[in-house]
Amino acid sequence: MSLSNLPTEMVNPKTRNLDARDTFEILKLINEEDALVALAIREVLTEIDKVVQMCINCLEKNGRVFYVGAGTSGRVAYVDAVELIPTYSLQEGVFIPIIAGGTQALGKSVEGVEDDEEGGKNDLFSYKPSEKDVVIGIAASGRTPYVAGALRYAKQCGCKTALICNVRKPLLAEYADVVIAAETGPEVVAGSTRMKAGTAQKMILNMISTTVMVKMGKVYDNLMVDVMVLNEKLRERAQNIVTHITGVDKQTAEIYLKKADYNVKVAVLMILSKNDVEECRKILQDQSNLRKALQIAVR
């Protein structure tokens, strides 16, 4: 399929004469088109669920999840992956973003790198992927050579693979165990896939990583109980989480957080189980899921 025939490259009939419209009308059109993104994602929830299960199985075997993309797709990958570390105390090197052109491409456009299929292979090769790992390629067009190189090599290494794209029947489907094709259609500005396509990619990656973290025991109720306390805002958030779960006041929450070295799970377990800090650490070392740890400790 030629580039001009891809839905993401087609002219959107709803936004013709865009340059002649007033500012508010342009904003209204963009908003209306953006509203279609969530509807497109609803159609691929089954495929997203398959990728979530794939990632959970991977992490349970101490594998890694790679995101691979070029341009907007690569930048979106970085935004999702790096935030998992402070939000869920995830160690570095578990969710790994790879962008065509390297990290310099995060802050500026590096031309031509998305066409380097061998570059995609080599960048993934540097991490020595194995059958324990999952590689998720991200490409609005479903055919980006850089992503193709990475996915093809991932299959050769025995990795589980997935493709997130915005077109039906993408060329790279042959290298993916699961294809998530969120058909977002023509952009407000024809071909500007940083808009609806990029938004869809960000939403899907958020859904995948968040659900994986929930199922890996890093959320209790709907609270980020593995949050890293790195600044004053996060310190107050940790206090609020402890207060919400245990019912103690913020001053008491702070006392227990200090005893627990600002580990929210340990602080909660200390308060509700009446065990000391070392005993709570031991319980959580054996059972990191707070809900299950509480069932063990509070009897």
Curated annotation (Swiss-Prot):
Domain of life: Bacteria
Active-site residue numbers: 83 (proton donor), 114
Catalytic reaction annotation: N-acetyl-D-muramate 6-phosphate + H2O = N-acetyl-D-glucosamine 6-phosphate + (R)-lactate
Pathway info: Amino-sugar metabolism; N-acetylmuramate degradation
Pfam families registered for this protein in UniProt: GKRP-like_C, GKRP_SIS_N
InterPro entries with a match to the protein in the record: Etherase_MurQ, Glucokinase_regulatory_CS, MURQ/GCKR, SIS_dom, SIS_dom_sf
GO molecular function terms attached to this record: carbohydrate derivative binding; carbon-oxygen lyase activity; ether hydrolase activity
Keywords: Carbohydrate metabolism, Lyase
GO biological process: amino sugar catabolic process; N-acetylmuramic acid catabolic process; peptidoglycan turnover
EC numbers, comma separated: 4.2.1.126
PROSITE patterns xrefs: GCKR, SIS
Lyase as UniProt keyword: yes
Keyword Lyase among record annotations: yes
Domain SIS: 55-218
Subunit structure: Homodimer.
Annotated family: Belongs to the GCKR-like family. MurNAc-6-P etherase subfamily.
Additional detail: A lyase-type mechanism (elimination/hydration) is suggested for the cleavage of the lactyl ether bond of MurNAc 6-phosphate, with the formation of an alpha,beta-unsaturated aldehyde intermediate with (E)-stereochemistry, followed by the syn addition of water to give product.
Entries under NCBIfam families matching the protein: N-acetylmuramic acid 6-phosphate etherase (TIGR00274), PRK05441.1 (NF003915), PRK12570.1 (NF009222)
Function of the protein: Specifically catalyzes the cleavage of the D-lactyl ether substituent of MurNAc 6-phosphate, producing GlcNAc 6-phosphate and D-lactate.
Protein name listed in UniProt: N-acetylmuramic acid 6-phosphate etherase
Taxonomic classification: Bacteria, Thermotogati, Thermotogota, Thermotogae, Thermotogales
